[in-house]
Amino acid sequence: MGTFDDLTKKRNVVVTTYKRDGSAVATPVNVVVLGDHAYFRTWSTAGKAKRLRRDSRVAIAPSTARGKPTGPAIAATARLLRPDEVPVPREALAKKYPILQGKLVPLAHRLRHYDTVHYELSASEPTGPPN
């Protein structure tokens, strides 16, 4: 199985999700690694959230801020966190990215009336994109 150890100190990563037709969509996100899992947040109507509702398989790799991969991808499975599971990763994201994830992203989500959702990524065996 893959591990997220290499992503612990990375500022930017790219999460690749899959459309219905199996084509990959790579999106840069901020993640925080806690133990054997990585966490990120988005809003509930974002394209990646819609794709994750249909297919939880993802690939995650270190990247530039614009999403260009800078290292090997790790196959993973994404799980939407329940509201009672959110405080720990939310606080960890705010600690790692104090301005962006601690202030700006939450403010933008509130101002735009977005429902913020958090995902947990667990490393898995690579299975390839869906058919």
Feature annotation, model-predicted:
Residues M1, L7-T8, A38, A75, ...:
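Residues at structural and domain junctions
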Residues M1, V15, D36-H37, A94, ...:
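Generic intrinsically disordered, low-complexity segments enriched for polar/acidic and small residues
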Residues K10-S44, L52, V58-P62, G71-I74:
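Short beta-strand segments
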Residues M1-G2, T127-N131:
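Basic/polar N-terminal segments that are highly enriched at the extreme N-terminus
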Residues M1-G2, L7-K10, T27-V31, T42-A49, ...:
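A generic short-segment signal for beta-strand/edge and adjacent turn/coil regions
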Residues M1-V14, K68-T70, K103:
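Extreme N-terminal tail/first-helix region
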Residues T45-H118, S122-E125:
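Short, structured beta-strand-loop surface elements
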Residues G2, V15-G22, L104-H109:
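Short helix-to-loop capping/linker segments positioned immediately adjacent to catalytic or ligand/cofactor-binding
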